Curated annotation (Swiss-Prot):
Residues 118-189 form the PRC barrel domain. Keywords: Chaperone, Cytoplasm, Ribosome biogenesis, rRNA processing. The PRC barrel domain binds ribosomal protein uS19. The gene is rimM. One of its GO terms (cellular component) is ribosome. Belongs to the RimM family. This is Ribosome maturation factor RimM. It is found in: Cytoplasm. NCBIfam families: 16S_RimM.
Amino acid sequence: MKNVLLPNNQERKRSLSNSEIFTFDDKRLLIGQINSLFGVQGWVKIFSHTHPRENILFYQPWHINVDANWQTLEIIQGCVQAKTIVAQIKDVFDKEQARAYIGIDLYIKKSQLPQLKSGEYYWDDLIGLEVINKAKIILGKVSNLVDTGSNNVLVINGEREHWVPYISPFLIKVDIDNQIILVDWDENF
């Protein structure tokens, strides 16, 4: 347990007894963070990394890491409230109990994601893949992807940073088994 200093300077143990401790056999993915309180009945506001942001509510259960212990966090209900996501955590009934969760990152197991069709990939599958152009020059490794609104862009770090649109004709092939992405991209761009 971790001591949490509350606004009135009283210490209280952060107790997440409603959670089940477990060990991850599966890769975990960061999907959001509890960032503030909502109301007085123990609801919390969630900053979601999912797109669209309300999709975070469909990935249940959430997993949290408290003092190096992975735990399952049960959500009783959640919804979109104006421009934010709010949720009620099981066995949390007031704002003082909810305060202990502020700042905690929310994860899911990768196995919780829906199966994709052949040729479709989650961004997480592409991070770390080596990117090679048609001239067989290694541009670097995918460090991130950016959604520009019209298409996604691979951010590649190598001798220099490259931003390659993740669309045809620039994207030629993704080979997950060999950890390679083949692109039609000049090394000087």
